[in-house]
Amino acid sequence: MSGGDVEEYLRGADMPEEYRRYYSSLSGGTYDIFEKAASAKSNLADSSGMVEPKIAVDLSDRVAKMHDLDIAGPLRELLATKGKELAALMLAKEIMDGKYLPEADIEKRIDSAVRVGLAVVTEGVTIAPLQGIADVITKKNKDGSEYLSVSIAGPMRSAGGTESAVTMLIADYVRRQAGLAEYQADSLDDETGRFIEELRIYEREVGSFQFHVLDEDIRAVISHLPVELDGVDTDPYEVVNHKGMSRIQTDRVRGGALRVLNDGLIGRSKKLLKRIELYGLDGWEWLAELKGAVQTGENKEDAAAKRMREVITGRSVLSMPNRLGGFRLRYGRACNTGYTSVGFHPAVAEILDHTIAVGTQVKIDIPGKGATVAFVDTIEAPTVRLAGGDVVKIRDVAHGIELKGSIERILHLGDMLISFGDFLENNAQLVPSGYVEEIWKMDMEAAGAAQGSPSSADEAVRISRELGVPLHPRYLYYWDQISHEELAMLLSPLDKGDAISYPAACKPVLEKLGVPHKAGPEGPVLEGDEARIFRELILDNPPGPDASAPVPELISRSSGITIRDKFSTSIGVRIGRPEKAAPRQMRPPTHCLFPVGGTGGPTNNLLKSAARPGFSADILSRRCPGCGEPSISIRCWACGERTAVERTCMQCGTDVDGEECERCGRPGLAHSRVEFPLKKMLVSAQEKTGVRAHDPLKGVKELAHQDRIAEPLEKGLIRQSRSLTVFKDGTVRFDATNSPMTHFKPSWIGTSAEKLRELGYETDVDGKKLEGPDQLVELRMQDIVIPLEGAKYLVSACGYIDAELDKLYGAPPFYKVPDLGGLIGHLVVGLAPHTSVGVAARIIGYTETHVCFGTPNWHSAKRRDADGDADSIILLMDALLNFSRHYLSDRIGGLMDAPLLIQPLVLPHESQSQAHNIEVVKRLPPGFYEAAAARKKASEVGCVEIVKSRLETAGQFGGYHFTHGTSSLTTSRPRSAYSTLGSMLDKLDLQIRNANLIAAVDAAEIISNVISTHLVPDIMGNLRAYARQNFRCTACGKSYRRIPLAQRCSCGNGLIQTITRASVEKYLKLAKRLVNEYDVGAYQRGRIHALSDEIELVFGKGGGDQALLTDF
C-alpha cells in the first residue's frame, strides 16, 4: 500500500473518528520519514544509496513484500472471505498453478507456494518462511515415483510449535495439487530409526524440547508422513548408528526438523487435528492415535511443582504452591496487568527489600508458566508479625516502608491479581475464588442495596445482619483454614472486656487466621474492630461442637452472620529473569561496522589498526575510477565521483564485468583482502564530521555478509562522540522488558495534560476534558511509555541521527531534540528478536521503571506477550536511514532480529488470539464466579466480554475497561535487588533471608533445591568443561582445541586456559557452607563432598579454602 492507499483504507474502515485521525497521523508520519530518509540516501554517501526496509501496512502487504510477489490484493480478498487458514491454502494453490510465477519451473512454484502459505499462517512477521525452510524439492522413492521433501532449518523455531507443524500440512496440500506421490519412509534406509537416535542425541547433548515424546510416536509420525521431513544440520553432534543414509545429506543432528517433529507434529497433534478438519485433508487420521506430548510421566500438577523446584541461586522463592500465607489468587485485571502480567501489592516489594520490581519475571504454577510483575494497590496487602510479637495488616506502601525494619515474619503475602484472559489463553481450569470485595458488592446488589464498603466493624456487622449478606471481606479472616480444635481454643479467652486477651498458646492460631493483634504480657490481645468481630462471631454466641460441618458454617449458624471462605488457593511464585532496560550491544561493543582482522587487538581498535603500516582488510572491492582510491560508499570519499565494484572470478582469477565470469560461468567474488588507506580515511572522516576519534574506536574483527560491506567511518565517529554503539544491522537500539498498559494517568508518565492534548488525547475515560495530572486516560493502540534510561539513550541517538544527516548525507537535521521533552511524540519501531518486522509506535512519556509499556495489541503485533522477554526500540529514522541487509550474515538465521519491513499501523483484528482473549469489563459477572466455584475450564465461560467479541467493530479500538484500579505503577525503587546487588553471595543471602521471612516458604527445602538444580549441575558442568576446554591467545584471541607443539600462538604470543580451577570451584565453598548450615539431607551433603573429592583428584589438594566475605 502507498500512503494514499492507506488513507483510502482508513476512510472506509469501521472505526471511531479519533482513531481515524490517529492512524492517519501515524501512517503519514511514517511515510514522511521514509521520504526524508530516501532523499538523504540519494546522495550515495553510504553503501546502499536507498532505504532498505519496506513499509507494509497489513498482513497481505507483509506477505507480498517479504516474498516479492504481487499478491497483496488477492490475499486481502481471500482473507476477507475465507479467513487466514483457508486463505493460506488457496493462495498456495494459485502460486503452485503458476498464476503469480508463470515463468518459473514446477519446483520453484512449489517452493514459493509452501513458503507463502506459511507466511500467511504466521502473519508475515517471522523469518520462518524465508529461512526456517531451507529447501522444498522433489525426490524419488524406491519405486521411482516423485515425492515432496521439505528441509527445515533452525529459524523455523520462530514460527512456534503449531505453525511449524502446519508447514507439513501446507506442503501435503501443495503436493496433492501438483500430483506428486506420497513419501515412502524406510524404503531405502531406516529413516525412522535415524530420527529416534537423532532426537535422543539432541536431548542429551544440545538441549531439551518443549515436550518429551515417545519413540513409538516418532516411529508412527515418520512412517505415516506423506511429505518427507528433512533438515539442515544445526549442531556439531553426529549420529552413531545411522550414518551415510542415501536420502539424508548430513550425519549431524538437524535441530529444525527435530523441533517440527517433537514440538509440532507430536506435541501439538491435538491442535493439528482441528486444522486438518478445517483444511479437508485426508490421510492424516493417524495423528489421533499418537500418545502426544508427555511430561516425563508426570501429571499437570507434578509438572507445575517441578517448575517451582527449579530454583536458581539468588532468585528467591516467594510462595510455595497451596501454602496458607502464600499469594492468594484474585481474579481480575488492572490497567497495567493481564496479557501474562500479574499484579502484586506494592508493599510486598518494599518489605522484601525489592526482591521484585515492575517487569521482573516470575515463574508461577497457574494458569501458565511465566509472567511479569506489576503493582496494584487495591488488592489485599500483606499481614506481618513484628519483632515484638504484634501482628499488623499493612495498610499501604508508606505503612510497609515504616514497618519494614521491624518485620519478623510475613504471615500472609496478600493477593496476586490474575486476568481471566490468562486463564482463557491457557484454557486452564478455574479454581474457586476466595470471598473478595467484588463478590460482596454483587451480593449487596442482589440484596437491593447500593451502599459502599463499611467504614468500621460495627457497620459491617450491621449490614450483614440487616441485609443478610456475608460479612465484608475486610473483616473476614481465614476461618476456613483452622481446625475445630483450634476454633475451640479461641472460645476461651482470658479476658472478654473491651480488649480480648488470649493465652500464648492461641497466638499461632490467630496468626493462621490473619487477625491483627497486640502482644500482651500473657499472650495476644485483640482490640478495636478485631475484638468487635470476635465477640459477634464466636464469643457472644459460641458455635457448638460439630465435626461434620466446616468451621465457617459453624460460625455462621451460631452468630447469624454468614461467613464465606477467605482462602481460595495460593500460587507458587519464584523469581525468574530480572527486568531489563539497557542498550542493545554487540559482543564486544562496537562503534562502527568496519573490519580490522587481527590488527585491532581484543577491542578491534580502529585507531590501533590505522597506525599499522600497510593495513589490509577483507572488504568489498569498491574503487573510484577517477582517483583510484578504495572506497566504502558509493560516492568516493576522496574526490566525490561514483565508485564501482570490482569482481574477480573465484576459479580463473580474471576480472568480471557483471555478476558471473564469461569464461567459467562462476559468480564473481566482490570482496578480497586489499591494502586499505584506513589512516587517511579516518583523518578525512574526522575533518568531515568535526569529531575527533578517541582510543579505542571499536570496529569488528570481520564482516558477516558474503560481500563484506562496511559502514562509513563517519557513523562510528559520531556514535563514539555520543557514547552510542551499533548493532549488527547498523541501527542503535535500546532493549526493555515488555509490559502491558491499557490506561494511564499523565502523572504516571511525566507528560503534561497540555502536551497530551496536542497528541490527540482530548478527554479522559469519563469523557471530561483532559486538564489534570490524575485523570485516567485510555492508551492509544500504538502509543508507548518507555524507561527513562531508554529515553536518555534515544535523545543521544537523535543527536547522532541529526549529525549524520548533516555531516555525512548533507541533509537538514530531522529530530532537533534538545532534551527529554523533545522526544515526546516521535515515532520509533519495536522489534522482537525472532521476527523481521518492526512495528511503529509513538512515544508519549517515560517512567522510572525498566519496562516498555504498550497496549497488548502493540506487543502482539511483535508476536510477544509480557512473560518476561525484552524487545528492541529503534528510532524510526534510524531504522530507515541506517539499516542494511548488507551488514547481516548470509547464513541461515541471519535475517532474524532485523527490520526488513516496517508496519506503520496495528490493526486489532490482525493481532494474535492472546490479545483477543483479554477481558474488557468493569467487573467480572456473577456467572464467572459460579463457573470458578464449579472448577470449569476457562473456555467454557461465555459470560465475560473479551476483545474477541468486539472484532470487526469500532469497539475493537477502544472503550476497554478493567476491574481493579491502582494509584501508581511502581514503588520506591525502579530495579529489583537481583539487578542491583553485586555478588552472587549477596543475592543468595537475600534469597535465604526471604525464605526465612515468608511463612509460605520452607527455607530448608529451598536450599536443597538450590543445591540440586543449580549448584551441583554448575560444578559438574564446569568440571566437564575444564576437561574439554580450548586455549586462547592473549594477543589476537585465536582459540585452539589443543595446545600446538610450539606452545605458542601462530602470531608468536602465549596461550592461556579458558577455564581455570577457580571457575570450576566457584560455587563449591558456598555449597559446602549450605549443606553444613541447613538440614538438606544426607544425600545432598554426600553429593557435595563427593564432588569436592573429585575436584581434588583432578587438581590436587588445594592450599586451603578461600574465605568468603560472609565468613567474617
Curated annotation (Swiss-Prot):
Enzyme Commission (EC) number: 2.7.7.7, 3.1.11.1
Sequence intervals crossing the membrane: none
Keyword RNA-binding recorded: no
Keywords on record: DNA replication, DNA-binding, DNA-directed DNA polymerase, Exonuclease, Hydrolase, Multifunctional enzyme, Nuclease, Nucleotidyltransferase, Transferase
Record bears the keyword Metal-binding: no
GO biological process: DNA catabolic process; DNA-templated DNA replication
Highest rank taxon of the organism: Archaea
Disulfide partners: none
GO molecular function: DNA binding; DNA-directed DNA polymerase activity; single-stranded DNA 3'-5' DNA exonuclease activity
Catalytic activity as recorded in UniProt: DNA(n) + a 2'-deoxyribonucleoside 5'-triphosphate = DNA(n+1) + diphosphate; Exonucleolytic cleavage in the 3'- to 5'-direction to yield nucleoside 5'-phosphates
Stored PANTHER family: DNA POLYMERASE II LARGE SUBUNIT
Role: Possesses two activities: a DNA synthesis (polymerase) and an exonucleolytic activity that degrades single-stranded DNA in the 3'- to 5'-direction. Has a template-primer preference which is characteristic of a replicative DNA polymerase.
The family this protein is said to belong to: Belongs to the archaeal DNA polymerase II family.
Self-association state and partner proteins as the record states: Heterodimer of a large subunit and a small subunit.
Protein name: DNA polymerase II large subunit
Species this chain originates from: Cenarchaeum symbiosum (strain A)
